[in-house]
Amino acid sequence: MLKKVVLISGGAAVGKTAVLKNIIPLLQSKDLALSVCKIDCVATRDGLVYQNINIPHVVGISGDICPDHFLVSNLPELYHWADEKQSDVLLIETAGLCHRCSPATEQMAAGCVLDCTSSCHAPAQLGPMLTYADFVVLTKIDMVSQAEREIILWKIKELNPTAKLFTVDGLTGYGAEGLADWLSCFSKETNF
């Protein structure tokens, strides 16, 4: 029975799939049955990533609809699918263009993935995707200085003081263990 839903959102090429690829085996090592839903706008090859690591997955292409609106309109079917797969945790990866579709995030652990190389001003441009996030993941941390990373972390804390912050290197997996541990313990009231 589905116990937890984790929403991973962020712009194109920020490393959402790389983060998931690193935390999936860590969550599975905690005896959690996982499934993944990938929602993209036009096309994606990320389904192959999940197929290669042998995890139940489904891909949705939103087309001319915002990926978040597409997600909300398909949530009942998605929960049913995850239940059929006997998943404890459903991981949803979305482009999250508007991320304003509450109640989608009310019963989910909502996460925002941000690329450190984008700019120290990027967090302010993410709007609700960042300000309503339960956790924020910084990627490409190896490509910026410690000082730049601290400035970005400070900007994020300024915009969302309650979000838990993680730095994850999508290539090496550095930092993924802390995120996986936190996600396995994090809980919200759920009524799927």
Language model segments and positions:
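Glycine-rich, phosphate-binding/catalytic loops in enzymes
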Residues: 25, 54, 107-110, 127-129, ...
